Amino acid sequence: MRFRRVLLGHLLVTATIAAAFAWEFGSGVRAIPSHVLVVGEWDLALLAVLSAVTAVAARLGVRLPGQTYRYLLAATCTLQAYLYTLNVVSHVSWDRNMTAHLVMAFAPTVWSGREPFPVGPIGIVAFGGGTCLVIAAVFSRWGRPIDRAAGSWLGRSRLVRAAALAVASVVLFAATLRVGIGGRDSLYWKQELVSSFFRPEGFAFEPSARRHAVAAHDAVLRATYPAAVPGSHDKHVVLIIVDSLRADHMQVYGYERPTTPFLSSLVDSGRMNKVRDAFSTCSESFCGITSTLSSREFQDISAETFQLQDVLRRKGYQAWFLLSGNHRAWNGLPRFYHAVDGALFDGSQSERYTMDDDRLVLEGLERVPPASPGHPAFFYVHLMSTHYLGVQFDESHVFTRSDDRVSPGLEPYTILERLNKPDRYDDKVLQADGMIRQVFTQLQAKHYLDDAVVVVTGDHGEGLGERHWAHGWHLYNEDIRIPLLLYDAPPARYPDLTFGTHVDIAPTLLDRLGLPIPDSWEGQSLLRPSTRRFTQHQTYFIPHRFAVLYRDREALFKFIATPRYGNEELFDLRKDPREEHNLVSEQPALASLLRQHVSEGP
């Protein structure tokens, strides 16, 4: 066997796997040659370094084992198998390449078994060890021709030439990898598996001319927004976002089970208002959170967006971010928050709880000093109770048995069904309501609620088996119909609470404070009546699936389109809240009108 055949065979397998990723996950064919280039340069660097080591050993009278290159190639293939497997998991789960940052962030939690995951420690060890043994067995059985081919090539190595080649090949590989790591915006590199694995924490705003234009306009707004506004109020502002919280499983929205006793008591007493039909702009956390803070559709958001907390800082507010979950691991969210040192506390910093345990928010609140006159504060509180990864407390088994738990590794193919079954979800809605009560209690004890406005909402909904499980892929009501609750001390009057979306939250808060709403914000204040609107919604994992909600007084329609595949659905949400009757063929004029409002993205 000639040695070039060994290398070409390895690269052929690599190219085939890269092509499979491009075909199955839409990662783009341009990433195939980039991936083959990285692996090929690694093979050459490995061979060149081994040649240099062989030449040095020969000078010293030492002979390396003839199977050395076979072992190194087997190790390379094993690492590739691990990388490909991690990326299959990540693409199936959240349609993104796996990164070392994510592995380091979530490995301790998964390994500990303290949070549910389809495969527990035993499964991880079994897969890792089994993969290694299988590859070792293959190379042991059919590796002798590789030894002969490598031996004939390595035997001709000369020290000076081998050393120079080793240095050159290592430098070339490092330079290529550096280009790949920095090529986040390149069609050839952004989906390449090796370089994307070593990128620093991700950031999910794809650059576009539209985003650059909005960012440039926001830079002017940031510089010119008034620091002092006559007649404005320095009320404390609290934004509570509960992950994966859908309105139709909340008692306060008419659900038959008592899942929200605290929130219901506030609404019943008149201290809290609710928007009847509220929707998230997106069915995934990243775009839901960023749209809420920036009052923008996702396609208009960038790291430089002028956001709610930026406006409030101009007014002298201290901004606090108390966040269940590991926000540092997901798409560079802290960069978007513009949080100053010490003001952001998330699951990666807790000393008492795992990263998806909402009790860590109370731990973070302990760090917040009591309110003082003339020092208004903004709080963004994120709770994970209703997310399928959110920790369920032992005392939170009301609609399920206390022994009805999900053990890692037991049922890998039904893990989402078991985590998301309605009884368990209702338990966790009740738990979230209890956590909100505790947040209110702590804020009240520190006098932040003496003069405050509080918003309680969800970042998106959650599929519970109606059509699918979990979130991120669809735009039906179970995916994007969320609560939107407003608590005011003293009370405020809202003339129209029939309809609202994420993008309305920030304008409403500024209007409540008597502050001007930036002209680039896309939402509407709920303090001002509105009868006719078109609102944009989209998925994050499937970037070309959109929805338009059309509200005209009491009428409410939803148009869902995936233009790339020609799929369209139209629903009358007043008559058909379960979205079972597609009206596209029955109401072509309305479908045509809403089709014109479908956004194709940046």
What spans do the regions from the language model cover?
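Generic structural signal for small/hydrophobic residues in well-ordered secondary structure
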Residues: D243, T292, L312, L365, ...
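Transmembrane and membrane-interface helices of multi-pass
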Residues: M1-K190
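Histidine-centered active-site microenvironments of extracellular/periplasmic hydrolases
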Residues: P258, Q444-P491, T535-F541
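C-terminal cap/loop subdomain of S1 sulfatases and analogous C-terminal strand-loop tails that border
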Residues: E462-E466, D511-E569, L573
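A long, amphipathic alpha-helix that forms part
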Residues: F197-R199, A204, A219-A228, L362-P370, ...
